[in-house]
Amino acid sequence: MNKETNKLPVYNETTKKYNVSVYADDQRTDENNVDVYIAAPFTLASREQEIVIGGAWNKSELKKNNFGGSYYTGGNVLNVDALNFNDMNTQIVVPIEKNQKGVLNNTVQTAGYISGKFHILDPLKAVAGVRVSNWEYEAVDGKGNREFKNEITPYFGLIYDVARDYSAYVSYTSIFKPQNRKDVSGNYLDPIDGKSYEMGLKGEYLDGKLNAALSIFRIEQDNVAEQLYDSNGKEVKVKDSNGADTPENAYFAAEGVTSKGVELNIDGELNENWGLSFGVANFDAKDAKGVDYNSTSSRTTADLFVKYKNEAWYAGAGLNYFSKIYKGTGATRVDRGDLYLANAMLGYKFDPNFSTQLNVNNLFDKKYYDGIGSDSMIWGEPRNATLSFHYKF
């Protein structure tokens, strides 16, 4: 993954002016994965069973180059009233030169696991497993180095065939997830620890051409990072060794964060010409004090996509819905209202092996914020199109 950053510093409260110096960097994340396992099917009580034993290794390495800094023609500050981002002289006075820095940090994860699929009775199946994980983070400057060993995360599930076309299931999964958020003193928060429960019903219709699933879930977690605000609703920053603010937001470990919700999905073919994909989900998340958690995620989302095909041609259109989100508290609270986005698709199949397809996202070029913060906003993607060709060998 590659990422390039260009930054303009924010408004200076002391001078009442904007600093228009410029800074640039780029970074890349390299990932390597290895997963080796052995599957051993066997028969017990005249029913097929399976045991899987394996191990996994993952290394994620962050590399970064700094290009240094400069400032724009006209000085390094401008009066706030005179600043016009649409008419700026963007000539850089001092060339920005690349400063190779190399690897900043790496994260290594190793795990061993064993799992099984068991056919207990004709209508009843079970899945179960356990994973033992090791996690290590190492930075070049030695800051934040930490390691967790022999973390055990089991899971278990039951599937029961209620009728020929219906099955019900329940599942349990334990959660262990290291995180990179820091408290106000600059210490990394402990890993997220928790449990996940889910139950649902799945059905098949029209000879298996149309599938539907309804599920409810509950997730209980501790040590979940929650952003820290002062009594005025202003973001609290991580302090350096001298007690001064850094640019990094501070977090605290919220206990008893509970998320619960419901999901409904329908997908498949209605007949030889029409296809349908529909999904709706709703969840609520609060900490032990009853305060909303993850308020920048829509509590309700829905998507509908209808597809029509006639011989070689096929076309589709859809609508996505995202409920309102917010960030912050009090006077610094920022809201984004409900959001609707339309998409469309058109394709042509030249023969059984060769086809082409045009996808258009955000069909009506809706202007919206995809991410919100107390002092920053992220624009959502404008209307965009992708033309692809597919060939099967």
Annotated model-derived regions:
Residues 11-18, 65-101, 226-251:
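Surface-exposed loop/turn segments flanking beta-strands in extracellular/periplasmic regions
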Residues 1-8, 168, 193-269, 276, ...:
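Membrane-embedded beta-barrel scaffold of Gram-negative outer-membrane proteins
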Residues 29-31, 48-60, 101-221, 269-271, ...:
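Structural signature of Gram-negative outer-membrane beta-barrels, strongest in the C-terminal barrel
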Residues 200, 379-393:
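Outer-membrane beta-barrel "beta-signal"
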Residues 2-11, 18-19, 57-77, 138-142, ...:
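Outer-membrane beta-barrel and related beta-rich outer-membrane complex signature
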Residues 122-123, 251-330, 345, 349-355, ...:
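Gram-negative outer-membrane beta-barrel transporters
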Residues 1-55, 59, 211:
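Outer-membrane beta-barrel domain signature, strongest for Gram-negative TonB-dependent receptors
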